[in-house]
């Protein structure tokens, strides 16, 4: 160690007594840092403090690029000169296997990608602190030595935010620009000036300009003033030094401008395209905070994670973009039409193609024409009401009036006629009334036969038609009159047209009396089988009426049994009943009985005594003639209840007219027979179930027994003792070769050993 110190002292000996290094400080700057050489004798600690005072640190050339910049700055100096760099090692910190051999940068780390040691590492104890100096000549190798010795100079490194380029020489300029760096280094040979540097320009006219390297509003750093800087020159010589446009200011200065799509560069003279280096994928336009803005073509949109990139827009997700079918592809979409249609000129709409389209258009026109004819039929049907207003009894849910006398020669005397107080419920609202769709409509409330809506009514022979019983009743006021379309039977003679019997009620206000329309019985078609009122309820009750010959002083009564609906829904005007074909018995019977499909208890069966029955009708029905007719006659009893008619789309409850019966009849009725038949059918079903269930249980038990038998009672191998097993194993290998082998597939000779523990 002492020998090395002596060698170092001997190397520095010739310089003792001589002038220090007479070279001026100089620097080399790049876009991000500067290296400055100060030829002043300092120890390592003094050099480090000098760099810190200027805002830098001792040089730390970590990469080959930084080392090359230091080499260009030092150049070919004297061979004996040394310069301190920022590399030191503490005592007893030798790490020869590392690139820096245990040395540490003055910044506190050991990261490096470049080393240039002058001597190989020596395995010593490292008892003292060591520092590294750079040779000023040759290959600028690194030498380690004592940190307390003074060397010829030191290298400082300065970092900064940005740099301004050196100014270009102008035509009216008196000399090169002089630059002053923040670390107080003055020179005219800089290529880059760190942030905060000052440039002084001297012009021939005697006036100069001073510029400062500052931050620009759009980002980065630049000179505070753009050229040209010297007055009196104007734009005549060489366009004022401007690349695109030169503008002479009022004060004699000139400024440069760029055409549209370009921006002025940092030198103040040249122009650059901001989109030339922009990372836009499709389209770029100058402007914006970065000097450019990215845009996408039609059919694309900017990506959410990267606005410079464009992604496809799925136009088919937009509602109504195509009339029928839409297919999306990258950059656009296309509309398609289904089979039988073709795309129109707009590329969106579809129209029927060829003859099919013409036929479709013709069908559409015919449909519209039919709708117009239907509307005309409605108008004609309503015009028929002008001369057809007559006095009719109120709707079933209205107050009762005097009972009709049916235009008969006799007038039956009912004890209840003196106090006609029938408790009909008040309607919550009047049912809506609409015009009939066709002249012949099946919306009838009070008729002598049930209204058949779901099927066409067959034409009946004249011999099977019931007599006509005209309805008469007290006259009503003009406000209470209800329009009626008279019953019309084109297939029947007038002598055999059915009579229309209506319920007599008290007068109601006009707002609660919708018109009563009688039914005409032509052959109905399915299209004309809808009720006249848009909100109607049809009682689907199958009613069978036995009509005997009516003796004198007997009133024909028909009772329809069924469930009574609540009075809150009286908004129906149509009865759809399906009558069964039963012969009408002309002989006198004590009562008239009506049966329905649902079984009804005998308490609900109503009979009419003979004493209260009116005289026979003028024309009796022929005996033993099957018909599809019933005779619903409106009740006049003060305690009878009006039938409640449900909606057509709901359930079909039974229609009921309640009449008091003085004496219940004991004769068996068709209702009881129907109930017994249904009970018998139900008993047959239960008998079938009672037979099937035990049979299934018996089969399951047999199956279980078979499984148990197969698993527990099958053949098993006999149990053997463990000694037998050993004997079998031992003698198995000593069989004589002449012993015959059992045939393949046979269990003969196969011994199994099963032991019990």
Curated annotation (Swiss-Prot):
Q: Which residues lie on this side of the membrane: Cytoplasmic?
A: 709-757
Q: Region (Disordered) spans which residues? A: 618-662, 737-757
The annotated topology with respect to the bilayer is: Single-pass type I membrane protein
Glycosylation annotated at which residues? Answer: 60, 401, 428, 448, 456, 459, 472, 519, 541, 543-545, 587, 593-595, 598, 601, 612, 619, 623, 625, 627, 630-631, 636, 640
Extract the GO molecular function terms from the UniProt entry. calcium ion binding; carbohydrate binding; extracellular matrix binding; extracellular matrix protein binding
**What's the chief localization of this chain?**
membrane
Provide Extracellular-side residue ranges.
Answer: 18-687
Q: Where is the signal peptide?
A: 1-17
Q: What is this protein called?
A: Endosialin
**Species this chain originates from:** Homo sapiens
Gene name linked to the record: CD248
């Amino acid at each position: 160690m002492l020998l090395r110190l002596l060698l170092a002292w001997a190397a520095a000996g010739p310089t003792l007594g001589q002038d220090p290094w007479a070279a001026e400080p100089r620097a080399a700057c790049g876009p991000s840092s500067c290296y400055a050489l100060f030829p002043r004798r300092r120890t390592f600690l003094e050099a480090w403090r000098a760099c810190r005072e200027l805002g830098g640190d001792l040089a730390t050339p970590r990469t080959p690029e930084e080392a090359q910049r230091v080499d260009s700055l030092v150049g070919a100096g004297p061979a004996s000169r040394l310069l301190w760099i920022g590399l030191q090692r503490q005592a007893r910190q030798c790490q020869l296997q590392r690139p820096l051999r245990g040395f540490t940068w003055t910044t506190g780390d050991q990261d490096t990608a470049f080393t240039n040691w002058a001597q190989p590492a020596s395995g010593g104890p490292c008892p003292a602190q060591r520092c590294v100096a750079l040779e000023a000549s040759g290959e600028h190798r690194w030498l380690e030595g004592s940190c307390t010795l003074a060397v010829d100079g030191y290298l400082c490194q300065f970092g900064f935010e940005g740099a301004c380029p050196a100014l270009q020489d102008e035509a009216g300029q008196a000399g090169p620009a002089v630059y002053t760096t923040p670390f107080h280094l003055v020179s005219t040979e800089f290529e880059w000036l760190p942030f905060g540097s000052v440039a002084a320009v001297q012009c021939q006219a005697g006036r100069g300009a001073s510029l400062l390297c500052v931050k620009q509003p759009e980002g980065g750093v630049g000179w505070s003033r753009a050229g040209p800087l010297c007055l009196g020159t104007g734009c005549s010589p060489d366009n004022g030094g401007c690349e695109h446009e030169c503008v002479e200011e009022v004060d004699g200065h000139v400024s440069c401008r760029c055409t549209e799509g370009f921006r002025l560069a940092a030198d103040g003279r040249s122009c650059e395209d901001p989109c030339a280096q922009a990372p836009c994928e499709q389209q770029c336009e100058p402007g914006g905070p970065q000097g450019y803005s990215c845009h996408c073509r039609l059919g694309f949109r900017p990506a959410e994670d990267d606005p410079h990139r464009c992604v496809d827009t799925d136009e088919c997700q937009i509602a109504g973009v195509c009339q029928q079918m839409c297919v999306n592809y990258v950059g656009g979409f296309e509309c398609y039409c289904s089979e039988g249609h073709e795309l129109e000129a707009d590329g969106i709409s579809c129209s029927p193609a060829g003859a099919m389209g013409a036929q479709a258009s013709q069908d559409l026109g015919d449909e519209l024409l039919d709708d117009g004819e239907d509307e005309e039929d409605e108008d004609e049907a309503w015009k028929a009401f002008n001369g057809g207003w007559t006095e009719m009894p109120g709707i079933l849910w209205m107050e009762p009036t005097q009972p009709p006398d049916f235009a008969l020669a006799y007038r039956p005397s009912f004890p209840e006629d003196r106090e006609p107080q029938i408790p009909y419920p008040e309607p919550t609202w009047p049912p809506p009334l609409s015009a009939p769709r066709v002249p012949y409509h099946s919306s009838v409330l009070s008729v002598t036969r049930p209204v058949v809506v779901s099927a066409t009514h067959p034409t009946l022979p004249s011999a099977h038609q019931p007599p006509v019983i005209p309805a008469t009743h007290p006259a009503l006021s003009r406000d209470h009159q209800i329009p009626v379309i008279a019953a019309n039977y084109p297939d029947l003679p007038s002598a055999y047209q059915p009579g229309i019997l209506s319920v007599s009620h008290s007068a109601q206000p006009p707002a609660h009396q919708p018109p009563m329309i009688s039914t005409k019985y032509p052959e109905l078609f399915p299209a004309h089988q809808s009720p006249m009122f848009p909100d109607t309820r049809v009682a689907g009750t199958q009613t069978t009426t036995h009509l005997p010959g009516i003796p004198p002083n007997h009133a024909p009564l028909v009772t329809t049994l069924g469930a009574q609906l609540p009075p809150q829904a009286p908004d129906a005007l149509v009865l759809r009943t399906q009558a069964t074909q039963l012969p009408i018995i002309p002989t006198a019977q004590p009562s008239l009985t009506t049966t329905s499909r649902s079984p009804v208890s005998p308490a609900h069966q109503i009979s009419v005594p003979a004493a209260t029955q009116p005289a026979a009708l003028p024309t009796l029905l022929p005996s033993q003639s099957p018909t599809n007719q019933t005779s619903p006659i409106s009740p006049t009893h003060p305690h009878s209840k009006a039938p409640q008619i449900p909606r057509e789309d709901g359930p079909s409850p039974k229609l009921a007219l309640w009449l008091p019966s003085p004496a219940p009849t004991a004769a068996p009725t068709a209702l009881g027979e129907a109930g017994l038949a249904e009970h018998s059918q139900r008993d047959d079903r239960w008998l079938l179930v009672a037979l099937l269930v035990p049979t299934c249980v018996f089969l399951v038990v047999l199956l279980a027994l078979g499984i148990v038998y197969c698993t527990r009672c099958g053949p098993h191998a006999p149990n053997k003792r463990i000694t037998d097993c050993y004997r079998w194993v031992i003698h198995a290998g000593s069989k004589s070769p002449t012993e015959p082998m059992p045939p393949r597939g046979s269990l003969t000779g196969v011994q199994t050993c099963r032991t019990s523990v």
